[in-house]
Amino acid sequence: MDVLELLRASANGCYNTIFSDAWSQYVSQQITSSLYLYIALGILTVLFVAWFIYFKRLARLRLRDEIARSLNAVTSASGGDLRGLRFRKRDKMLFYGRRMLRKMKNVSGQMYSSGKGYKRRAVMRFARRILQLRRENMPLEMRTVEPPAEYLEETIEGSDRVPPDALYMLQSIRIFGHFEKPVFLKLCKHTQVLELMAGDYLFKITDADDSVYIVQSGMINVYISNADGSTLSLKTVRKGESVTSLLSFIDVLSGNPSYYKTVTAKAMEKSVVIRLPMQAFEEVFRENPDVMIRVIQVIMIRLQRVLFTALRNYLGLNAELVQNHMRNKSITISGHLNSQSQSSQSMRQQTTATATGGTSATALGGQQLPAAVPSLPLQRQPPPPTIAPPLRHSREEHTLSGPNPNPNSGNNVQLPEVHGDAPNIDIYHQQQHGGSTSTGNLSTRRGSLVQPSIGGGGGGSTAQEGGCAAAGAPTIDMRLIQSSAVESLRKELGLPNEDAHIIEPFVEVRELEPNVTLITEGNADDVCIWFVMTGTLAVYQGVADATRSSTATTKSDKSDLLIHFVHPGEIVGGLAMLTGEASAYTIRSRNNSRVAYIRRAAIYQIMRQRPRIVLDLGNGVVRRLSPLVRQCDYALDWIFLESGRAVYRQDESSDSTYIVLSGRMRSVITNPGGKKEIVGEYGKGDLVGIVEMITETSRTTTVMAVRDSELAKLPEGLFNAIKLRYPIVVTKLISFLSHRFLGSMQTRGSTGAPGAPVEANPVTHKYSTVALVPITDEVPLTPFTYELYHSLCAIGPVLRLTSEVVRKQLGQNIFEAANEYRLTSWLAQQEDRNIITLYQCDNSLSPWTHRCMRQADVILIVGLGDRSHLVGKFEREIDRLAMRTQKELVLLYPETTNAKPANTLSWLNARPWVTKHHHVLCVKRIFTRKSQYRINDLYSRVLLSEPNMHSDFSRLARWLTGNSIGLVLGGGGARGAAHIGMLKAIQEAGIPIDMVGGVSIGALMGALWCSERNITTVTQKARQWSKKMTKWFLQLLDLTYPITSMFSGREFNKTIHDTFGDVSIEDLWIPYFTLTTDITASCHRIHTNGSLWRYVRSSMSLSGYMPPLCDPKDGHLLLDGGYVNNLPGHLWRYCRASMSIAGVFPPFCDYRDGHLLLDGCYTNNVPADVMHNLGAAHIIAIDVGSQDDTDLTNYGDDLSGWWLLYKKWNPFTSPVKVPDLPDIQSRLAYVSCVRQLEEVKNSDYCEYIRPPIDKYKTLAFGSFDEIRDVGYVFGKNYFESMAKAGRLGRFNQWFNKEPPKRGNHASLNEYTFIDLAQIVCKLPETYAVNTAEIFSEDEDCDGYISEPSTLNTDRRIQVPRAGNSLSLSEAEMDSDVEIDFRSDSKKDKATQSTPPAPGKDNEDKTDAVDRIPLLTLERPLTDQQQQHSDETDEQETPRAMKDGTNTMTTQTTSPTTDAGSEWAGSESELEKENKNVNTKN
């Protein structure tokens, strides 16, 4: 920094008199010739030293002369003889004693004072003794504790209790769902062990595709054969992996087994493979139909999630996944003859009526159909119709092996057009003025379908697709249309003729005009089975993008992509019907069409009577898929990982990539020294390991599951095959990787710097599931959850779940191990439909609390900030249960008290597992003690109001969803007063501030805002501090000898300390950081904790003016952070460190490590990149630094200083612009800062703002009000222009301006998980009589037995292998010995905490109940009850809870009670249960 500029600014800012101008001019002239000043100082120093030496020598000579005179006097007095003189004995003893003691003291000092650091301590003691320094009391330091080993290491557990072959089979068949032990043992009986040599075929083309193959040892290569005879590898199957196809599984179960057409598997080395025939499942399904239905549903769900997610969202394949049209399909539409109402002749006339514009059946087929024919088959092509059963749908040539007619096809696939002359299968039509009477079964039910009904009295006016109906066309009886639709749907559902009466009451017919939307993508209310009778339906899908939010529900029609057409005789809607999820497509009518449909509730009622129709529906979905999907089905794998399990490890070969379907993954790198660091975290929808796979390099990190997670594995072979077939995939991936690398380049600046916190790593701060845990029973957890839920509703759909809500939706016994699949599936669907799900834990270690820990991406530990910080037993158990899950501390403060956060370090030091903390100011209603019912009633009204976007709850909500808004304040001396005006303008613009970072003067202003959050108070304190900086006499008293800096920094420290006091960064309301330049380690440092005033002072230590601040942590010297990054404990210390201007103020010594800190402007004067790394999604960066003059004079190859002096002093010559020595040094110091600033300006996450304050100098603190007004006016105009241009929405685009409507804050009843097995097989809800006993048993167990990956077999039943089967022998399969499938650790834990075994009577009763078949557990319904159940299913009327949240209608026969009474009843029952548990314990 130029000294001349500073002194001029000081003079101009404080004095306007003639004397001050003359004084400043005189000083300027003197400093200009600084070389002469230094020479003069040197001469004076030499003269002073010479005089000092001369004086000391003169004094020594005088002393010697005096001694000589004294000796001469003694000699003369004794006559010149000194032999008679001697010392006295006591003088001798005293002399020798002192001498001995002096030697002993030196020896002891060497013994006890030597060692490491002795010299340094001795020098410090000597300096204190000389300079009389006082060691001030150091503040409380934050204890730095390394995370536990489990946080960064994977879980490596053996499976000694399970034979390897049985374990591999368990892991392979779990893709079909969860199987109980008896079912698994029955499947084991059908296994076969195959031994293959290298080169042997496991299966090849034309072999039956009817088995599941599990590799026990060795390696199998799965490849496809092309038409030219070449092969292309899909994947390599290694030990423990399997080869299976979900689509082939459905084919086998439906009685239509297929064969391998293009896929072949060959052993690459000697291998042992376990073969499980798919026919083995049929035996199990016959005995347990609910298992069959559940397996079909699981297959459909995973088909939709794994295949469609991988191929559609990431590879850009849409229309290629389904067949564009069905060829060689013969459709039969039956028209039942009604002899009671019409004669045979009239029926024959009606059957020959035209379906399109008067075309007769004779014209279509070339012959007259006999009247005795009960069905009229028609084909799409003009050849004559034949009476034949429906043929299977042929597949469109979308394969990996066939030639691609359009290699650039991707999203723009040309589908065959179906024009008006397309044949229709419904040969009946209505006359425009017909008068047929419809039956009672044809009553039109109006849902969300907005299309005209079939006229009054059964007739209607409908335009057919071939043209307008002729006026004289015959009239069709609606009963014949209805019977035709019933017969067609009966055959599509695979029902025999005698079961037509089952579906007849539920079949509805609609006449559609062109462009009528039947159902939209993402809609779950209007899911139906649609059968096209005439016309054509078009199926669309939104343009998929890997970065697109799953919660987006509104999009224009232009973004929809045409997938395929549904022609007459085809059915659509089976996938959504079987999965129970929302529709994945948008279906519209392409022209005038007639469709028959059955609603979802009706289909489920039909399934109850005929469960086998799920196979026909599933087979219909499979037939529609292209061969490409089947080939991908062999290669794509579904993987379930428990918490701690590794996806892949560092230095392993990379042969696949993974897609996170649910859960959370953590990437950890192991450095050469063995230390492990977090590289990043991945959430739902992220792509893991894609870079290593494409570049064919080994894995650079280890990726493990933070919680239970589901992944889709995409092998490299499949990726290459799709790449060759569809080049559009390359474009899709290039776009995806470009965005990823661009983001990593923009955030690379401060990553990995010394002193950077863990949050500086590129960890995604966007969570899908959040668990809320109270520290004590005094914490108002329910009101806190409601307030957070209220703020989250402004961002997107959110769900709040408690144990009471889950039991109310899914039954009281939902937390039992038998209901594991139903609970996990329901929770997974809720997480998919909402951007975030809140899991409110119980106040004890209940099964629900265990479930919350397993489901959570992050755990919020909620406590009261004004209470004790001690850790409770319950909180320690939470850390033990979820060691890898990130935990954040939330401290609540009542709004009525004006107290600020304090003692936060004590909270954090007591909880080393906490990675972040939040201070939340709560309104009065949160701490009001009320009953659960009154709390629910209160927040049912609060949730209808608009949330306060500036509250701490909204700030916490934005942090959890990855929408935080950061404010970065740059350095610039007195020009930083513009920050105050900009803060006021930001507040008036309605932009919330969630995080603040600053450098130099920006560190001071940002710390004031985080501490006060009131613009008036911040302005007053900033003005007072600026006024102190204008007192020149205090600055003169602070002058010192300019070895390190011009000022000692004592008075400057006092001004910052008086502003903040002894406040720590952890005690600020808003997350804050400051940046300094560490001259000890030659890097920048980010301070997010510690002494506030010290690090602000360090960030303001400009070189040459203030000495660097010595970091008390490690002793490093810190300078102004602007030298490396001009935009980014006790608070004042780090503020002081951030203001340590080199040369003016001395570097500030960090009290933690002793590093010297200087102003952060030397490294980064606008640290917006640091803010982005800390989790801010949108950033406002305000730059008030000085700008260097780039218009310099070209003086040639050499430069004479005398010529510059002549140009400067000669008023008659033109001035030249050449930098002097201080200016050159300043430009060199700011080189990295300028580069960092340009990157910030070009980033897409930052809004760079620079107020017009260039005319103000760095030390013009006297112009505080003027500079502040300039910043305010500029900021107000800037944000108004942004609002007019529509760019202000990037800072509040997530915020819902409209208040939420009633019932919108919970969506449990709008859409919920549908368990087909429970619906079809009528499995009743079993409510326990004594719920306290259930709670006591559940609380003792450690979680669930959720997945087979942790299942271990008891050693008691392990016997040697018998025959070509699994290691489980026949005796084991038939024995009644209970197999414990838990892991070793969990079993030992459960063994220690298992309660005593129940009595003999209870055990016998339990066994008796288990032996009853599932289908006989339900009491038969009476006719009246059945009618009431049917009406309930058809209407699907939701019930609203009293607290404003919706609940799901359960499949029970109990009458519906009042919502308020339900809440009150559940609360009283919960209190009784807790009392019983406490009593029993």
Swiss-Prot record:
EC number(s) given by UniProt: 3.1.1.5
InterPro entries: Acyl_Trfase/lysoPLipase (IPR016035), cNMP-bd_dom (IPR000595), cNMP-bd_dom_sf (IPR018490), LysoPLipase_patatin_CS (IPR001423), NTE (IPR050301), NTE1_P-loop_dom (IPR056556), PNPLA_dom (IPR002641), RmlC-like_jellyroll (IPR014710)
PROSITE patterns, A to Z: CNMP_BINDING_3, PNPLA, UPF0028
Subunit structure, interactors included: Interacts with Pka-C3; interaction inhibits the catalytic function of Pka-C3 and the esterase activity of sws.
Active site: S1000, D1120
Motif placement: DGA/G: 1120-1122
Membrane topology: Single-pass type I membrane protein
Family recorded in the similarity comment: Belongs to the NTE family.
GO molecular function terms attached to this record: lysophospholipase activity
Compositional bias annotation for Basic and acidic residues: 1379-1390, 1400-1410
GO biological process: glial cell apoptotic process; lipid catabolic process; membrane lipid metabolic process; membrane organization; nervous system development; neuron apoptotic process; phosphatidylcholine metabolic process
Topology feature Lumenal, residues: 1-34
Protein name per UniProt: Neuropathy target esterase sws
Residues bound to a nucleoside 3',5'-cyclic phosphate 3: 613-740
Motif stretch (GXGXXG): 971-976
Segments traversing the membrane: 35-55
Gene Ontology CC annotations of this record: endoplasmic reticulum membrane
Post-translational modification Phosphoserine, affected residues: S448, S1214
Residues that bind a nucleoside 3',5'-cyclic phosphate 1: 175-302
Reactions accelerated catalytically: a 1-acyl-sn-glycero-3-phosphocholine + H2O = sn-glycerol 3-phosphocholine + a fatty acid + H(+)
Region (Disordered): 336-420, 1366-1481
SUPFAM superfamilies: cAMP-binding domain-like, FabD/lysophospholipase-like
Subcellular localization: Endoplasmic reticulum membrane
Function: Phospholipase B that deacylates intracellular phosphatidylcholine (PtdCho), generating glycerophosphocholine (GroPtdCho). This deacylation occurs at both sn-2 and sn-1 positions of PtdCho. Its specific chemical modification by certain organophosphorus (OP) compounds leads to distal axonopathy. Plays a role in the signaling mechanism between neurons and glia that regulates glia wrapping during development of the adult brain. Essential for membrane lipid homeostasis and cell survival in both neurons and glia of the adult brain.
